[in-house]
Amino acid sequence: DAGVSWKVYRNKTLGPISSVLTYGSLVTSFKQSADPRSDLVRFGVAPSYPASFAADVLANRLPRVSWVIPNVLESEHPAVPAAAGAFAIVNILRILLANPAVWEKTALIVSYDENGGFFDHVVPATAPAGTPGEYVTVPDIDQVPGSGGIRGPIGLGFRVPCFVISPYSRGPQMVHDTFDHTSQLRLLETRFGVPVPNLTAWRRSVTGDMTSTFNFAVPPNSSWPNLDYPGLHALSTVPQCVPNAALGTINRGIPYRVPDPQIMPTQETTPTRGIPSGPC
């Protein structure tokens, strides 16, 4: 116990498509989950979303670190339309904005565990061969259930989206520093002074701690942002998703109709923070 309060909020009301599907099996792997008095159950199982989360925000008792686990319909995993995830993000922000005293000291980090395809023109950083702690070297790993038989470097991988939304990161702006999922742990390490012991020196040298996503040199902009829900045009994708949901599986989808004619996409631009940006 490092003295940093935390909770995991998850949806429990949608049966098989609630957060239990994506999170429940992970928690029950720990023996503490069988004890209703344990901190794991009190803070990692009992809290619900949106009820407990909204109540804690309104009462100004949100813990210092919170995780919100979406239900399957909000996860943007095929065959669910990506617009459903956008609705979920807006709903979380609306809950936070309901209490300005909470919002002015809160940062919402929206993270993804996978990219949207199998191609990235940017080659990820890879640790030199033999770097301790950065290579899987277990013999006969293909005999380990669920391992996929992969031996070699542990990341980095294809790029995935990440949004940092707070009064200190108003933009929109883009940060070009290199982060990975452990960067969120590094941010907590920097903010609360609790060391993360399981990160190698190589990973620390390659990835940042996400402090560069904030600008503390200017007063916070805690005004109400534009939170319009995704346009109704996004619902046009739903008919395309129904066959996948009904006939496909979570790993094997039905091909979508290829638009015709096709045009080359236009690369979007946005203001960027300096490189390296670091804490302001």
Swiss-Prot record:
Organism: Mycobacterium tuberculosis (strain ATCC 25618 / H37Rv)
GO CC, alphabetical: extracellular region
Full protein name: Phospholipase C D
Temperature dependence (free text): Optimum temperature is 37 degrees Celsius.
Subcellular location: Secreted, Cell wall
Protein encoded by which gene: plcD
Keywords recorded for this protein, A-Z: Cell wall, Hydrolase, Secreted, Virulence
Functional pH dependence: Optimum pH is 7.5.
Start and end residues of each stretch annotated as Disordered: 258-280
Purpose of the protein: Involved in virulence. Induces cytotoxic effects on mouse macrophage cell lines, via direct or indirect enzymatic hydrolysis of cell membrane phospholipids. Hydrolyzes phosphatidylcholine. Does not have hemolytic activity.
Gene Ontology biological process terms from the UniProt entry: lipid catabolic process; symbiont-mediated disruption of host cellular anatomical structure
